Amino acid sequence: MLNVPSQSFPAPRSQQRVASGGRSKVPLKQGRSLMDWIRLTKSGKDLTGLKGRLIEVTEEELKKHNKKDDCWICIRGFVYNVSPYMEYHPGGEDELMRAAGSDGTELFDQVHRWVNYESMLKECLVGRMAIKPAVLKDYREEEKKVLNGMLPKSQVTDTLAKEGPSYPSYDWFQTDSLVTIAIYTKQKDINLDSIIVDHQNDSFRAETIIKDCLYLIHIGLSHEVQEDFSVRVVESVGKIEIVLQKKENTSWDFLGHPLKNHNSLIPRKDTGLYYRKCQLISKEDVTHDTRLFCLMLPPSTHLQVPIGQHVYLKLPITGTEIVKPYTPVSGSLLSEFKEPVLPNNKYIYFLIKIYPTGLFTPELDRLQIGDFVSVSSPEGNFKISKFQELEDLFLLAAGTGFTPMVKILNYALTDIPSLRKVKLMFFNKTEDDIIWRSQLEKLAFKDKRLDVEFVLSAPISEWNGKQGHISPALLSEFLKRNLDKSKVLVCICGPVPFTEQGVRLLHDLNFSKNEIHSFTA
C-alpha cells in the first residue's frame, strides 16, 4: 500500500525496480518527488493536525478518518495521517484509500513491506492504537521450556502444524572452549543458504528458512563469545550446527535469556527485514554508468544470498532512511577474474546502474572505500528446484535485468548435469551499455553449451548484430528446444513493460506457466 515516492532509482521503467504484482503507477505532479516529500517533512509544517501531540487511537476513532482529506491508516499498531502524502504516492490516491480508516498492515505487506515507513512517515505519526486489556499470565515456566529448545505449540504456524509433529526445535551443548547450537529443522532441503546468523555483543540471532516460514532463535547469550564462528549443515537430516568459540574457558550454566520472537516460527511475509552494516571494499566501473560494488559482511554474520533472490540496501539520505532492492551477483563470470582471497560467504557483489539525477544511486556512488551500507536478509520466490533435470535454459535480460542471470549462468554451467543448452538474449540500447560483454563472449567460447545474442535498440550503423525490442520474431527464432519434449525453463528480467510483454509472448509461443520465471519479486 504505502509506496516510496521516487522519480529516481529505480526509475519507473527501470529493470532494477522490484515490481509489485501488476499495480499501476500514476504520473506524479511536478514537485511531488521523494526529495520534495522529504523537504516537506523537514519544513516544520504540522502534518498530523495534532500540533505535535501523540494520542491513543481507538478502533472507533480510526474508522472516522476515512476520507482523502482526512485519512488515517494503521500499520503494525501505529497510526499515521497520510492525507498530506496522497499527492506523493506513485500508486495513486485510490491505492492509499483502500486502507483508509483501518489497519493497512496486510495490504502494505502484500506490496512492499521492505519500505521504511517509520522513517518516511515519522512526521505523520498520530499515535498508537489503543490496546484492549489482557489477562496477565506467568511466562516463567514457558521461558524455561523455550531455552531448553522446546517450541510451544502456540507458536507453530497453522501451515506446518497441519503437516504433523515435524516442527523445528533446537538444543545446545558445550566443551571447555566451544558452544554448539543445534537446530533440528525436520526438513531435507536445508543448505547453507537456509541459515542466516548475526551476533553482536551478547545478542545472538539465527534465522532458518523452512519452506515459506522463518524459524528464529534470538538469545541474549549468558557469556561472551568470539566474533568468528562456523556453520555446518547435515542436509540428509536437516540439522544445522552453529559453533561458537567461548572467550573464557568456563562452563555455562545456561545458554542465555530469550529476546524478541525467540523460538518462533513465523510466515516470512509477516516478518520484518533484519539489516546488518556491511563495509564497502571496492568499487569499479563496468560500463559508462554501471559499477561493480563489493561489500564485506561483518565477521559476526553468516549470510549467503540464494540464486535468484534479492536484498535491500539502506542509506540515510537527508535524515530519512531510503531503501532500494538489488540482486547480488558473482564477482565475475570467469574464474580467472575472480579474487581467490575473497571467500563467497563473506562478500556480496552488486552491479548497479548510477542515475545522475536520482536520489539513491548518486549517494551510493559517493561512498568511500571503508564506508558502511545496511544490507537486509534475502527475499525472493525463485526455487533452485526449478533446475532439476533441466535440459534447455533460456535467459531474456534487458539492461541491469541481467543481474539475476549472473548467478544462474554460473550455477547452470557447473551444477546441472542434465543441461544441454543455455541461451542468453541480452537487450540493451547501445554497445556501450552491455554489461560484461567480453566475459560473456569468453564464457561462450569456453563452454559450447552457451549461446549469447546481443540485441540493441539504438545501435550505430556499423552494428552487425540483432536490432530492435523484444518481439515475436526475435523470440520464435531464439527459443528453440534442443529436443521436442526436453525440460525447459525461461527466465526473464528487465523493466516492467519488457517483462510483461515478454511473458505474454512466451505464452503465445506455448510455454507453460511452470516453464517461465519472471523476476518481478
Swiss-Prot record:
Residues the record lists as binding heme: 89, 112
Polar residues composition-biased segments: 1-18
Gene Ontology molecular function, alphabetical: cytochrome-b5 reductase activity, acting on NAD(P)H; heme binding; metal ion binding; NAD(P)H oxidase H2O2-forming activity; oxidoreductase activity, acting on NAD(P)H, heme protein as acceptor
Domain CS: 165-256
Expression across tissues: Widely expressed.
Main localization of the protein described in the UniProt heading: endoplasmic reticulum
Matching InterPro entries: Cbr1-like_FAD-bd_dom, CS_dom, Cyt_B5-like_heme/steroid-bd, Cyt_B5-like_heme/steroid_sf, Cyt_B5_heme-BS, Cytochrome_b5/Flavoprotein_Rdt, FAD-bd_FR_type, FNR_nucleotide-bd
Catalytic reaction annotation: 2 Fe(III)-[cytochrome b5] + NADH = 2 Fe(II)-[cytochrome b5] + NAD(+) + H(+)
SUPFAM superfamilies (UniProt xref): Cytochrome b5-like heme/steroid binding domain, Ferredoxin reductase-like, C-terminal NADP-linked domain, HSP20-like chaperones, Riboflavin synthase domain-like
Needed co-factor(s): FAD
UniProt region (Disordered), positions on chain: 1-27
Domain spans labelled Cytochrome b5 heme-binding: 54-130
FAD-binding FR-type domain location: 273-385
EC number: 1.6.2.2
Source taxon at top rank: Eukaryota
Function text: NADH-cytochrome b5 reductase involved in endoplasmic reticulum stress response pathway. Plays a critical role in protecting pancreatic beta-cells against oxidant stress, possibly by protecting the cell from excess buildup of reactive oxygen species (ROS). Reduces a variety of substrates in vitro, such as cytochrome c, feericyanide and methemoglobin.
Similarity comment text for this entry: Belongs to the flavoprotein pyridine nucleotide cytochrome reductase family.
Protein name in UniProt: Cytochrome b5 reductase 4
Organism: Homo sapiens
